[in-house]
């Protein structure tokens, strides 16, 4: 597991979180309490912040990356599940969403509370 600072900003990962091996988290990343991050997840907060709420599950092989410019962060609410291999880029997921396996959520997209995004959706 690699939890690394980037440009003076260090990830915040509470002790209540479960972070598996082969996970890379770097930059301005803040995880809420009781999150689970499964193997081969990459969180890259190089340009803006990534903020993840409590009780969120990020499954195997996901990429979470910020966009350049104002408003390009990634905000993930509480109780969210992000399925295997999904890509989240500069977007907002509100509370209790389910993002299907392999889905891609692009810059500026907002997924409202309790929404389901189908596997493979773009």
Where are these regions (language model features)?
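Phosphate/pyrophosphate-binding betaalpha-module
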Residues: 49
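Left-handed beta-helix
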Residues: 15, 20-21, 26-27, 32-33, ...
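Terminal amphipathic alpha-helical/low-complexity segments used for targeting or macromolecular assembly
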Residues: 1-16
């Amino acid at each position: 597991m690699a939890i690394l600072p980037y440009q003076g900003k260090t990830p915040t990962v509470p002790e209540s979180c479960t972070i598996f091996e082969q996970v890379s988290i770097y930059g301005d990343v803040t995880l809420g309490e009781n999150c689970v991050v499964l193997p081969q997840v990459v969180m890259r907060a190089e340009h803006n912040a990534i903020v993840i709420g409590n009780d969120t599950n990020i499954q195997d092989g996901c990429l979470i990356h910020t966009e350049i410019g104002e408003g390009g962060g990634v905000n993930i609410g509480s109780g969210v599940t992000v399925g295997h291999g999904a890509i989240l880029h500069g977007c907002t997921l509100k509370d209790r969403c389910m993002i299907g396996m392999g889905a891609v959520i692009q810059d500026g997209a907002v997924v409202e509370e309790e929404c389901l995004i189908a596997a493979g959706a773009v």
